[in-house]
Amino acid sequence: MQELKRTPLYNIHLAAGAKMVEFGGWLMPVQYEGIIAEHQAVRSAAGLFDVSHMGEIQISGPTAREFVQRLVTNDISRLKPGCAIYSPMCNPQGGTVDDLLVYQLEDQQYLLVVNASNTDKDFHWIVSQQVPGVEIQNVSEVTCQLALQGPQAEKILQRLTAVDLSHIKSFCFVYGAVEGIHCLISRTGYTGEAGFELYFPASHAERVWQAIMATGATDGLRPVGLGARDTLRFEACLALYGHELTDDISPLMAGLGWTVKFNKPEFVGKEPLLKQKEAGTTYQLVGLEMIDRGIPRQGYAIFKEGQEVGWITSGTFAPTLGKNMGLGYVEIPFADVGKELNIMVRNKPLKARIVKKPFYKREV
């Protein structure tokens, strides 16, 4: 059996009393004081996440722009150094290899931030597409990534850097020192809240983590594990690979059509996606609120009048709403907001209602 990987903050998590679990080949903190308390801290104050298990793949060289443009479905020609874009990366059949962030570091240099469980798969896929004039490096092991999220995030981080954080727009980044350590400071996140993601050498992980935690102590900052990271992204209806997106699920089916730019001359998966767009998808990703008591879990079947019409991709108790909610794929004729369906929970058909997504949106 392959030994589980550890982030540079493994000992910090143990000292903080974290409950550690296996996730995508890593030993990661699922919670510290508790998922609901950590979730509420991010919504009301701030939370600090160790996301060093995420993958970082650097692409550079004279043809890097054209290469990345063909690799992903979104249009990176609009990017300039200091900006980032969210995009799916598709296979030739139009299914999703992964969803990722593309950072433009320099004129012909990009950083692709991919999902932890997909890092090796993605790296090998990208290398298999390699063309002359492109260098591809997996820099995941030498990179620490932290996410500071929540309404107090900017106030907390500002105490540790001379960079004016208020000038960083959404999906943009700057380079600057945090606690004296050179970082890429990005206004991005995966929680539905305002916040930042920091990238810097893994050797400085403990120093930066401890400085942020100490600085934010009086503002309600809490360390946050993967459990609350999932409930936060779930309330914001942000896709999680392996759930809402897979090798067999296209970005169009997942409601991510806005990230697929058909006006680009070429990208992997373009032809099947174009056919799918013209014909329409069979299923639609919907939000579900439980009427009966129960939590819908991934893989549970969805029925309408005894006919199976879909399946659940994610489901949990949503702490901000105080309700049991789900995300799932439902056949188009049954996917209208307000429609009632049945979800098979432990062999019992429980009532649920289709509701608008996202379940939570931060008030600006």
From Swiss-Prot:
SUPFAM superfamilies linked to this entry: Aminomethyltransferase beta-barrel domain (SSF101790), Folate-binding domain (SSF103025)
Stored Pfam families: GCV_T (PF01571), GCV_T_C (PF08669)
Coiled coil listed as a keyword: no
GO biological process terms, semicolon-separated: glycine decarboxylation via glycine cleavage system
Keywords: Aminotransferase, Transferase
GO CC annotations on file: cytosol; glycine cleavage complex
Domain of life of the native organism: Bacteria
Molecular function as annotated in GO: aminomethyltransferase activity; transaminase activity
Catalytic activity, as annotated: N(6)-[(R)-S(8)-aminomethyldihydrolipoyl]-L-lysyl-[protein] + (6S)-5,6,7,8-tetrahydrofolate = N(6)-[(R)-dihydrolipoyl]-L-lysyl-[protein] + (6R)-5,10-methylene-5,6,7,8-tetrahydrofolate + NH4(+)
The protein's Enzyme Commission number: 2.1.2.10
Quaternary assembly: The glycine cleavage system is composed of four proteins: P, T, L and H.
Known role: The glycine cleavage system catalyzes the degradation of glycine.
Family of the protein in this entry: Belongs to the GcvT family.
Protein name: Aminomethyltransferase
Protein species of origin: Desulforamulus reducens (strain ATCC BAA-1160 / DSM 100696 / MI-1) (Desulfotomaculum reducens)
